[in-house]
Amino acid sequence: MKRKISIQSEHQLQKQCVKWFKLQYPKMKMLLFAVPNGAVLAGNDLQRIKQWNRLKAEGATKGVSDLILLVSSGDYSGLCIEMKTIANHSKQTKEQKEFEMAVIPQGFGYVVPKTFDEFRKVVGDYLEKGEY
């Protein structure tokens, strides 16, 4: 009998990573936060468009990374983290790539971890060595 392989969603991965970070680095827990640009909006098409337009007017921007770590380390001002998963071969969108290219010259690091272990390694290396 074949064992069913559980595929982790991006939501589950991000939740696991944030929980780990807050336990591992309690003094910095307020400095890692999510940017809810990918939030699922409720309602019909017209209602969702209105909700997005309201969020956009408040500064929501397509392509901004899922998580931002506002801790300087090494030569970096902070770390932008775009969560992806191995499932479905998820890739960055055009807007996410544009955001990456916009923040790097400003002194921010940018990473795209696809597993919990990758997240732990890049965040640990970033905070401890100033590199990722």
Each model region followed by its residue ranges:
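Catalytic phosphate/metal-binding cores of nucleic-acid and nucleotide-processing enzymes, i.e., regions
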Residues: 1-132
